[in-house]
């Protein structure tokens, strides 16, 4: 007699375990599953658990050489989504042993690597992940975090101000540096390379770094404040990226920048380690995020990408504005802003937070509001994001009819006014424009 029956078998026999008690060390995932017509939700949920952990479509004899019960992902709870036809939230628990320590790359390859192309599913979205302390402790996390950054910059009790230098492509290095200087001199804390400024024929990276450093030091000398410019170190290879970060450190500037999704988590984590070892702050841009997170029923929600970045490492990350030109709902955005900044975040479904998350004092990340905002949004932004944030106005600074320094000054004045009014107990939402 044979040891097992060959043939295709239902996933739910092995991978749907509604009685399972989740462990403190499990990585928990919440998926929004839209099964194909005729596929029961239990089978779809079990299929997700199987395909993203130990499963294959049939029993193989090598299954006998390991303990499936120890290593398999388990679908432990399913709930229908209110107001949606044939859509379910499926909860899956993964044993910690399935993941390499300190590798966001491996975590994602395991959890979302294969399962999204699965035939039994019409659509699949990863809504949230619970990262247990046992796993988050294997990551360095942000190079410095919010508190250390404030100490380095000597700026307290208010949001920081930034500005992306526009036109994003086409300026020469010297003119670029001039724009940087004018904005910093006018009162901003930071200026920023656009995410697609790397090292193009009209402006090579080394020239840009040099002129921006000059602009920073000149503005610092004249204002008596610490200034920075996010020098984009993103490059075609990890080696080239590190080379750029090394040059930035040699110039003595305070901060570099990386596009973490296009650059990849492996490169990002390498850069974050370099930044902590060498005292550089790291600004993270989320170019490509909407490709992954914009569809409501398929992809990965940005709060998961934000959690992954906090593990991989970054001191700032773009997180939507609630008020500008790009999409983002207020409560949901505030949910993942808290996930970035706070130590303990309680489960709260109204804000899209499916699991309580405990970060064990992994440093926090400053959320960056950027994209189509200008000075009249300031009261709203100050109220929504609070002190620990970076507010970035690109066109909102350089678009000032009198030029960059007045544009920068206007933003700074507005910010100081809003913060002062708030501290004096006025209601920003109501009285913002008079302030």
Swiss-Prot record:
Assigned EC number: 4.1.1.39
The keyword Protease is assigned to this record: no
Domain of life: Eukaryota
Record keywords, A-Z: Calvin cycle, Carbon dioxide fixation, Chloroplast, Disulfide bond, Lyase, Magnesium, Metal-binding, Methylation, Monooxygenase, Oxidoreductase, Photorespiration, Photosynthesis, Plastid
Active site (UniProt): 166 (proton acceptor), 285 (proton acceptor)
Cross-referenced CDD domains: RuBisCO_large_I (cd08212)
Annotated compartments: Plastid, Chloroplast
SUPFAM superfamilies: RuBisCo, C-terminal domain, RuBisCO, large subunit, small (N-terminal) domain
Site residues by UniProt (Transition state stabilizer): 325
Residues that hold substrate according to the record: 114, 164, 168, 286, 318, 370
Post-translational modifications reported in the UniProt record: The disulfide bond which can form in the large chain dimeric partners within the hexadecamer appears to be associated with oxidative stress and protein turnover.
Gene3D superfamilies named in the record: Ribulose bisphosphate carboxylase, large subunit, C-terminal domain, RuBisCO large subunit, N-terminal domain
GO CC field: chloroplast
Pfam families reported for this sequence: RuBisCO_large, RuBisCO_large_N
Gene Ontology biological process terms in this record: photorespiration; reductive pentose-phosphate cycle
CC cofactor note: Binds 1 Mg(2+) ion per subunit.
InterPro entries according to UniProt: RuBisCO (IPR033966), RuBisCo_large_chain_AS (IPR020878), RuBisCO_lsu_C (IPR000685), RuBisCO_lsu_C_sf (IPR036376), RuBisCO_lsu_fd_N (IPR017443), RuBisCO_lsu_N_sf (IPR036422), RuBisCO_lsuI (IPR020888)
UniProt binding sites for Mg(2+): 192, 194-195
Principal location listed in the UniProt entry: plastid
Note: The basic functional RuBisCO is composed of a large chain homodimer in a 'head-to-tail' conformation. In form I RuBisCO this homodimer is arranged in a barrel-like tetramer with the small subunits forming a tetrameric 'cap' on each end of the 'barrel'.
Family per record: Belongs to the RuBisCO large chain family. Type I subfamily.
NCBIfam families, alphabetized: PRK04208.1
Its biological purpose: RuBisCO catalyzes two reactions: the carboxylation of D-ribulose 1,5-bisphosphate, the primary event in carbon dioxide fixation, as well as the oxidative fragmentation of the pentose substrate in the photorespiration process. Both reactions occur simultaneously and in competition at the same active site.
Subunit structure: Heterohexadecamer of 8 large chains and 8 small chains; disulfide-linked. The disulfide link is formed within the large subunit homodimers.
Protein name: Ribulose bisphosphate carboxylase large chain
Organism of provenance: Drosera burmannii
